[in-house]
Amino acid sequence: MPDTDQAASWLASARSSLTDISVGPRTDRTGRVEDIGDGIALISGLPDAKLDELLSFGNGRYGFVHGLEEDSIGCILLNNEGTIEAGDAVQGTSGVVSVPVGPGLLGRVVDPLGRPLDGKGPVEAETWFPVERPAPAIIDRELVTEPVQTGTLAIDTLFPIGRGQRELIVGDRATGKTTIAVDAILAQKSNDMICVYVAIGQKTSSVQRVIETIRTRGNPDRCIIVVARPAEAPGLCWIAPFAAMSMAEYFRDRGQHALLVIDDLSKHAATHREVSLLTGRPPGREAYPGDIFYVHARLLERAAKLSAAKGGGSLTALPVAETEAGNLSAYIPTNLISITDGQIVLNRTLFDQGQKPAVDVGVSVSRVGGAAQSPILRSSVGTLRLDYAQFIELEAFTRFGGLPDTHVRQQLARGACIRATLRQGPHAPLDLLQEVALVTASQNGLLDGVTAKNIRTIQSGLGDYLRSNASEISTAIESGGVLSAEQKERFVACLRQYVEPRASAAS
């Protein structure tokens, strides 16, 4: 039986070898820091390093490879703790930057590496995802057919957004971009959508206001807030949107629905320009490196509606970008407009005139969301967008003088009513029933001559009134169904009973 004993001994040895195998990052490749400064380290001695590879400087200090040269590599640091000097050893890990993901992040405020910022203790991670993950293949995607209610009447009626869409919010500084994005999060308070908000280089006071708004008006237990503070290492700002995308993908890949707000990609582009120039990459237009389009495209392509075979989950992205003096033809805005499925453009002039949200109807568009709009809302809107666009053009023309005829005056009065209806206060998102009711009332002339302030007063109790006095119709609307002709007549009659006495009292 010697052969049997020999075979048993060999199998035991093989099992022992397999047990001793480690699949963790390797730390036996060592390089040397040649130069260090501004959050960037120049390293030699790691000829086999790969882009985005995680490097360890010891004592909990890490960075990742961002640039590869013939005899050196550029490394972006991920933390400011400790000191790194020229001549220090650096080890390649053969791993990549990863973040904790899972339900344990819900209700938490974390940095881009998943470290807690809310004082609630360590995050309970179900697993870890690399910050850079491939976008879903075309065969694994499905058409955008389900609506995302943003709670902003001007968007849900004129430029609807669907689950799995990428819709850019762009405008000058302080025109309400973050307000619209946060309102979209608040509007998910009572549904099944997970919300992730990532702040990139924003002022601490601004981020604190967002956190407090979500805590008091939304459902913080279904939200993840990722904060990359401007005082942190540039590497944290750079990976922030990618890390937040990975956190949202966890839920999408399990058949759930997620909404990601990236605030904002203009600051991320500035960070990418900074670290790229410091690592020696040649500058291009507006000093941005040539790969800036690719960086943002590979990020936003990860947002998608998955097919039923992949679980049917969705990840909707609302990236924010800033313009200067309304210049949409600048490099970063044009890049993002071409990458995304539409854009909500906010106009400084409209904002200063008190039209809030200051959505510019002429240049805003949603390329795929129209198919996802709720059928009842689509039928209620009718020619609203066309009427409003014609009103804006006609109003500008009449400013040159002349006496408008009766027909023109009627068009101007009708357009003024639409404009007043579309005005909305901050952090007061509307539900589907309220939106359908307001649009129906406007389209049937029930709000003609009523000021925006009085419309908001009428709107405040409208939903509760309809649920009490037209419960059957209200239930049909909230379920997304289409009303019959008889139901439409009853609905308009109920609206008239509610609106007319209140409009008269307001007058």
From Swiss-Prot:
The record's comment on protein family reads: Belongs to the ATPase alpha/beta chains family.
Question: Which reactions is this enzyme annotated as catalysing?
Answer: ATP + H2O + 4 H(+)(in) = ADP + phosphate + 5 H(+)(out)
What is the protein's membrane topology class? Peripheral membrane protein
Principal location: membrane
Indicate which residues the UniProt annotation says bind ATP: 171-178
Q: Does the keyword Ribonucleoprotein apply?
A: no
Q: What cellular component GO annotations does this protein have? A: plasma membrane; proton-transporting ATP synthase complex
Task: Site (Required for activity): give the residues.
Answer: 364
Q: What is the species listed in this Swiss-Prot or TrEMBL entry? A: Gluconobacter oxydans (strain 621H) (Gluconobacter suboxydans)
Q: Which domain of life is it from?
A: Bacteria
Protein name as annotated = ATP synthase subunit alpha 2
Q: What is its EC number?
A: 7.1.2.2
GO molecular function, one example? proton-transporting ATP synthase activity, rotational mechanism
Which taxonomic lineage does the organism of this UniProt entry have? Bacteria, Pseudomonadati, Pseudomonadota, Alphaproteobacteria, Acetobacterales
